[in-house]
Amino acid sequence: MNAQTSEYYQEAANPIATNPALWAKVTAPQISWGSTDIRYKKEEPAPIHSAQKSMNLTAWKGEKISAQLVVWTPKVLNDLTFMVSDLTSGSATISKENIRTGFVRYVITDELNKDGLGACGYRNSADFDSTLVADVIDHITPTLTLPANSTQGGWISVNIPQGTKAGKYTGTVTVKADGITLSELKLNLQVKNRTLPPPSEWAFHLDLWQNPYAVSRYYNVEPFSKKHFDLMRPLMKLYADAGGKVITASIMHKPWNGQTYDAFESMVTWLKKADGTWYFDYTVFDKWVEFMMDLGVKKQISCYSMVPWRLSFQY
């Protein structure tokens, strides 16, 4: 199966061959609401026996809630896209500007804990099969070409403004491809008369590590340049909006011996002078921390690390 690659996202080719027998009974594109708890396999029809055309969600004011739709098709679909309407309840409206759509994209992985020994440490790759698994929610790619005999998830997220009136809201998600409407799914949202505080007031201590070097490598831009920060802003805002409290700062070259695909470089420049004294330049560190704080992540800075795994010090 060919990889689905756009200028925004490079998807790996599927190492699992498509079994035509599984698609024999699928004679036309199928669209249904699915479950946010299921990672649908790319090479198999979705395990949905009766298409669900209506989704019922319940949320508080100020909450973000999501649903997943699924498209599976025996033929190529060009320019697949999802279009949402406003959600209305009488004269009250949740604007479609508060609704975000995205394609559920696939990443390559291997069998997890096949031998029962855990997932850390060296493993002989020949002993573990590789496959694609649904993981990334791609909000950037506007349309996608879906190959024949393949399945694609679509992620729909609704941000309910805190000032929203309680009630039952209804709207639609229209699935289009090749310039025509394939299906119109109904979305029902019951907004309760309770209000979730803004993320800045949440007590939960959310700490998801950030790697700005991965973004600069992926987009081939100078680390911590204006272009780099512009690219990171919508990405890191997702973390801030989820209630992120901690800034990840690497203050040493490869603190974990480069175990990640994109190594963490030092945000602090270490200089040892001829007279034996030390000078530390915090320019990059300051830029990064100020950037994250401006987005609302400001409770803690985790600095890695005074002693690196490899016991190798670069200066």
Give the ranges of each region predicted by the language model.
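Short, solvent-exposed loop/edge-beta patches enriched in aromatic
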Residues: 61-65, 72-78, 161-165, 180, ...
